[in-house]
Amino acid sequence: MCDNSCFCENKQDTIDESLDKTCIFCTIAKGDDRYTEILAEDEDFVCFRDINPGAPHHYLVIPKKHIYSCLSLYADDISLVRGMAEMGRNVLKANNVTDLKDISLGFHVPPYITVPHLHLHVLAPYSQLYKWAINKFRTNWYINEEKTVEILMKGKTQMV
């Protein structure tokens, strides 16, 4: 189990171009999935609703380039994490979420990911997680935005 403070030299490629054709999140990022409504998009990221929401508001923010997971993040990816979080907060505001202190923005740590493409969970209100989701989003296998940035700011090569 990860204690959210460890680092290792995980050799998984950050970007794997071969997955573009088979990764559902790459398909969504390209706008090629007719079943997914894009809620926000910019040059680097897209945001859409989670198909299995764990809270009244549950969105996913993904980078357009294929990045495996939070294990693939390096110290120079802090701006990527912050950009994803900013988009998530903006989507919450656009959906009339006003209490930004009762939210959670975070990543699941492999092996507890369902899609091998980096995705930031945006949950609100965090105090109203659905019963089935409580253990999924309140665990050491779920690392919030602040902790992710804190670990990356330590200047380690790669985060776990």
Curated annotation (Swiss-Prot):
> Where is this protein chiefly located?
cytoplasm
Family annotation (Pfam families): DcpS_C
Q: What is its EC number?
A: 3.9.1.-
Q: Name one GO molecular function term.
A: nucleotide binding
Task: State its role.
Answer: Exhibits adenosine 5'-monophosphoramidase activity, hydrolyzing purine nucleotide phosphoramidates with a single phosphate group such as adenosine 5'monophosphoramidate (AMP-NH2) to yield AMP and NH2. Hydrolyzes lysyl-AMP (AMP-N-epsilon-(N-alpha-acetyl lysine methyl ester)) generated by lysine tRNA ligase.
Q: Could you tell me which species this protein originates from?
A: Danio rerio
Q: Where in the cell is it found?
A: Cytoplasm; Nucleus
Which residues are in the HIT domain? Answer: 24-132
Subunit structure, interactors included: Forms dimers to octamers and even larger oligomer.
Fetch the PANTHER family from UniProt. Answer: ADENOSINE 5'-MONOPHOSPHORAMIDASE HINT3 (PTHR12486:SF6), APRATAXIN-RELATED (PTHR12486)
Taxonomic lineage of the native organism: Eukaryota, Metazoa, Chordata, Craniata, Vertebrata
Listed name of the protein = Adenosine 5'-monophosphoramidase HINT3
Family matches, as Gene3D superfamilies = HIT-like
Residues binding AMP: D50, I51, H119, L120, H121
GO cellular-component terms in the record? Answer: cytoplasm; nucleus
What's the encoding gene here?
Answer: hint3
**Class of this enzyme:** hydrolase
Tell me the keywords, alphabetical order: Cytoplasm, Hydrolase, Nucleotide-binding, Nucleus
Family from the record: Belongs to the HINT family.
